[in-house]
UniProtKB/Swiss-Prot annotation:
Function: Activates KDO (a required 8-carbon sugar) for incorporation into bacterial lipopolysaccharide in Gram-negative bacteria.
Name of one Pfam family that matches: CTP_transf_3
The species this protein was found in: Solibacter usitatus (strain Ellin6076)
GO CC, alphabetical: cytosol
Encoding gene, per UniProt annotation: kdsB
Name of this chain's protein: 3-deoxy-manno-octulosonate cytidylyltransferase
Amino acid sequence: MPRKILGVIPARFSSTRFPGKVLAQIANKTMLQHVYERAGLATYLTSTIIATDDERVYTAAKSFGARVRMTRADHLSGTDRVAEVASAENAEIIVNIQGDEPLIDPAAIDAAVLPLVHEPDVLMGTLKKRIEDPREIVDPNVVKVVTDHAGDAIYFSRCPIPFDRDRSADTPYFKHVGLYVYQRDFLLSYSTLPVGPLERSERLEQLRALENGYRIRVVETEYESLGVDTPEDLERVSRLFKASILQGMGNG
């Protein structure tokens, strides 16, 4: 696989619900270090870099040997921050890896990358997972996605899609897993695309691509996204880390 593929982890210190969360400790490492190390296990990433506008994050990343770059502080989204880093790199494919998912599955990263490697006309990709908890279907904080037979997104919504008119028990629902892959040139032009009414209504940035006529390839995964948005989320993830460590000791 000759193409250069760069993983970028946007990492802000400021967070409305949980300031400094990327530097929160989980099993004697910062959350950011866990994300960086997990991303490094992905087979198809040529390299990984952390993008931040905060000296504290920069210093912490350097302390565990990460590649890290300071970016402008005025970016409106993580995508813009990733694009700034991508503009200075010669990678052909860019992966936007969330900095608050310390359990990110390297295999999920690889699965999202592959379509853009094999089909250069696919400009953007992401992931979906089948919903198992019925409560998530009606939860507006869980973004749903429907795709066509080729696996390209038809729509993303906070509403239950599709609408199950006959209340069929076997209607599958899928939630969006927020890892994005871009062909570099498309990423660099993304912020110049006009924002449409669907993106404004749903408050979902990925709808900008669909509203402007671009495909998004959506790969199904078994990876259960466990993002850390609150101190309570951190406690839950910390318990999972402790359980996995104890399990590993028991198997040793």
